[in-house]
């Protein structure tokens, strides 16, 4: 019956069940053509098929007015869409040219395009009707070739199984998958396929090889991720609830005689627009409802296409490229290494726009088009499968990819105009795969210890709240600043007892603020301020670093989301969780009553200690020592500071600096003196005023001002540098880091003196902090590249905490990796690509351990002296032979989050 229905489209019968068909069906019933075991079940569906045949006959009558070419073409599609009577799930597909005669075969091959699709190959046990249909199809194909109709695209739609219930369920699943493919494979003529989508699942072997070759020779690739509802990365909502469905790639073909320009995309044929036959391919990465063998074949070819995309030498353009790379890594799964994406360079217009205007950190695609493109260009990003047809959605995606290409080229031209192209290409673009790899690797967390710590902190918070109510003489909401202000100053009058002339106020409040600086100034006058300070500290640890981490945990581990464009200084930022905000300094609390253990015993809690390395691995931390002070020394060129760093490296730079500043022997420098010097230095670096420094030091404002003046008088070149930075900002409206990063500061010309002073502080701060951020990013890139190039190292970069890089390393690789990391990072004082030559050496301190909160310093014997960066194995240049420290991993530290 299914054979009969399939052959209706070949005009063997235009009315259901003719006399000829009845005879054939009788022969089939006898068992010569059809298995008798399945005949009974097949006859049960006769009535349904008869209705389908009648309906199809009516459709044929309606089409008589159409041209002969369209009639023959659609008849052929109808035949192939209905399938064969007996098609094994293991049958494979062949090109349409396999059905052509020998004298027509060569001509048809030349007419095939990548958008050509597949037809099912017939089983060798096919019925007589199938053979007749095959001859009829051969006759039709000769007519089509004679009329120069080009390639014809067909698809498999029905598959027959012996068991009727199994056939029904599998056929429904396949029809659903085929219907989805129709949205991507426009069912019109082959020209329409070229203009819209080509699903790579429907390509034959010849077309697949042509696709790979086309990707290798492409002038540019424009990519976006598509979600199950039809939306893409180009939509306003960048975090859709729906899952990823596939990846769309618009391929810009190489112009005749043209050459790609991966290092300078704004040149040559790359600037030329797309032509009508530039293909748009669809790569499905969502699991499809077809049998495993074919699904695996589709996925394997999809991996090959994506792998070629990762290695492509032409410009690859993608909005939010980091998310695309992470999705590709997830699709590769266990079959792919993170090193497969290490060389990927994608042009991300959001990053380009952020370099031009750092204050606009998270613009949408539509925002960027409106801001940087011509007014006539419109963006269609709101169409989804829920409110538009698939063809409309797919057409919109193609048009938006063209707009994305044009936007990116315009932004690249602007980067060159602003002198930012080298920074974009050398520093920001290589970070994209690094951040994607970091997000794809989770860090293990000791969940049991974290839950225990949460309960302990919760009990301590309740005790502190009760103590606060007792010493205040009444109950109040301890987290309410207004109620606390009324208790401290309205009831207790502590501001009148303070020796300080004035305490900072908030807005127009009649009482001082309840900030940390004010509470520290009042802590010796009454027990309440001290209780409030401890309560806030414990509450922050519990809510942010314990309960917050528990909320982000999945399967006993966490993975932060890294934002490359989240700050104006160029620093990276993290969220869900903010791993950069987890303090390295432990806190001490008193054991709560009714808690296991001795009462009134001091516990030390380290939030970082809850992060533990995976089995067989160790954390390795590499920290730039005094990076911002070294940058300040380089920028200012102060002779005293240069002498401090250019001489033999000292054990404690800040102690030596204190000795220089206060003119006392190093042996007499106390810990308090050292900390005071450190805070003064960073007050200068960050542009903090005397008020903020006074709050940090816990001294009167006048004394803090004297510290600043004395320090700047000792190191006069620092003051000269600050004046030069401010003058440059007044002249150009922006400031620039040592690697060319710029920050516009329009308030530098404000009439309001307070706003203008703030902009001046930001100018000095940005030059130092932005330069340090650039150097840390450069360290990430060089170490990542060196590890990726190594045949032995497998270390994973798991976090960047500003001037610290955290790796997870296999235990036997710790010595080799530590040596490579130190040598690579310390060699960055000279970077030829950015024409950078620091006047001071860089120093990196290394530490390792099983827990992030309990890292121990690595002995100097583990690493060789600083030298030029190399990518080969450094195992021969470690410590002297026989040194036990050079052959053994650091001590194992499975320490709990609090040490008794």
Curated annotation (Swiss-Prot):
Described purpose of this protein according to its UniProt entry: DNA polymerase with very low fidelity that catalyzes considerable misincorporation by inserting dTTP opposite a G template, and dGTP opposite a T template. Is the least accurate of the DNA polymerase A family (i.e. POLG, POLN and POLQ). Can perform accurate translesion DNA synthesis (TLS) past a 5S-thymine glycol. Can perform efficient strand displacement past a nick or a gap and gives rise to an amount of product similar to that on non-damaged template. Has no exonuclease activity. Error-prone DNA polymerase that preferentially misincorporates dT regardless of template sequence.
Pfam families associated with the record: DNA_pol_A (PF00476), DNA_pol_P_Exo (PF18049)
Keyword Protein transport: no
Compartments where located: Nucleus
Protein name as catalogued: DNA polymerase nu
Field pH dependence: Optimum pH is 8.8.
One GO-annotated biological process of the protein: double-strand break repair
